[in-house]
Amino acid sequence: MTLKRLHTFLFLLVIFLGCTERKQSVSGDRTHVVLLGTGTPNADPNRSGPSLAIVVDDVSYIVDCGPGVVRRAATASLQGIEGLQPNKLNRLFITHLHSDHTTGYADFILTPAVLERTGPVEVFGPKGIREMNDHIMAAYRQDYDIRIFGLEKGDSLAYKVNVHEMKPGIVYKDSLVQVHAFLVKHGPWEEAYGFKFITPDKSIVVSGDCTYSERIIEMCNGCDILIHEVYSLDGYSRRPEKWKTYHKDFHTSSRDLAKLANLAKPKLLVLNHQLIWDSTEEKLLEEIKSQYTGKVVSGKDLDIF
């Protein structure tokens, strides 16, 4: 074997072993959480818009659909999460209707349909999600009419959306998961939700965007994973006054999250939708860990738990 061929062989072997290790690392449990986007309205090139997936076996349940959701799902599928293959995306849960959580909605509905998803999409969200859906589908009517009735001969059912406007309580249940929606406070939004997912091997609570919430403490109560939004007090201290007022009314400070986590007692706390500004991720973790001794990580796009 020539030296050049040996180098090529070793390079391919490293790639193969890396892929194998990734697949093994995500195959031990039935349930995985995949952070598809951990961003905020700030245009951070390293963080896609807010979205995460609960994947049980090979079935995915997506929470929120910020910009980039389908491409992040496609990337995760190549890392061994087969339930996130784009043509398998057909269940979506929306926490609230802020644009950073919903600008990927058309992408979520239309792109998997082009990629031959079978059957309709089930969407669960707050009051107003039906109107948003109807406007978006009307805007893209020429697109999907050509795809369905033109040379592609697309499946019309793949473009069908069943919209469910939620009320607090159990909003979805199948053989793999039960989903409980609960109200949280996010500024003046009339309806902003968090979710609790109960699967055969895990209980997972997703805060959505919110301030400190006793309801999250009740819903977690020792849950396996709590995924919670947060802002850095260090970064916050240098924000203009109008933004300080805004953030305090819409989001959860690191101090309040540490207090909440001490009472909720999750086995793992995952920081998400991190507002850091000119501070650092390390400083944010220091703020949490100074008052909370449980296991905590700062989530990044495509992290798997």
Q: What does each model-found stretch correspond to?
A:
Residues 3, 20-205, 216, 283-305:
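Binuclear metal-dependent hydrolase catalytic cores
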Residues 15, 93, 206, 270:
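Conserved Rossmann-like nucleotide-binding pocket used by diverse enzymes
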Residues 21, 194, 201-203, 211-303:
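Cap/insert and terminal regions of metallo-dependent hydrolase folds
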Residues 7-16:
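Bacterial N-terminal signal peptides
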Residues 5-8, 274:
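Hydrophobic alpha-helical segments, especially transmembrane helices
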